[in-house]
């Protein structure tokens, strides 16, 4: 099964702010790998960038999710900027003020500790509903 097919099997990935769910059952190594690759495919269709910044919050599951995302991004040959543990606005600042024009923030924000989330940034902001729909397709 391809990464896209695996992602399509989910009902609706995106909620009001990125993808959120159980850190163990949703954010599996394969899912993180696939969503990383799929985001790069989206960026390339829009001629955006081949460099991407990735940050995370201090949740216990965040480093594993980041590592698995990095594997998918690395396979696509993009230049990776590891922002480490950072506040959510750090990725937005990065894409507005440097040559890096896309980003991913791994954050559960205010949700329960066993959950986590992934937010995607492009076009100088968090991706739009239309962008989310395109990524899911």
Briefly describe each language-model feature range.
Residues 2-137:
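Gly/Ser-rich phosphate-binding catalytic loop and adjacent alpha/beta segment
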């Amino acid at each position: 099964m391809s990464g896209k097919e695996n992602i399509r099997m989910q009902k609706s990935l995106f909620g009001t702010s990125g993808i959120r769910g159980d850190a163990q059952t949703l954010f599996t190594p394969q899912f993180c790998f696939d969503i990383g690759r799929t985001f790069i495919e989206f960026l390339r269709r829009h001629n955006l960038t081949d460099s991407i910044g990735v940050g995370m919050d201090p949740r216990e599951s965040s480093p594993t999710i980041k590592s698995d995302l990095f594997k998918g991004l690395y396979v696509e040959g993009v230049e990776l900027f590891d922002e480490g543990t950072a506040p959510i606005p750090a990725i937005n600042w990065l894409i507005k003020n440097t040559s890096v024009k896309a980003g991913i923030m791994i954050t559960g924000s205010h949700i329960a500790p066993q959950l986590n989330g992934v937010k995607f940034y492009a076009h100088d902001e968090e991706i739009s509903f239309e962008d989310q729909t395109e990524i899911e397709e």
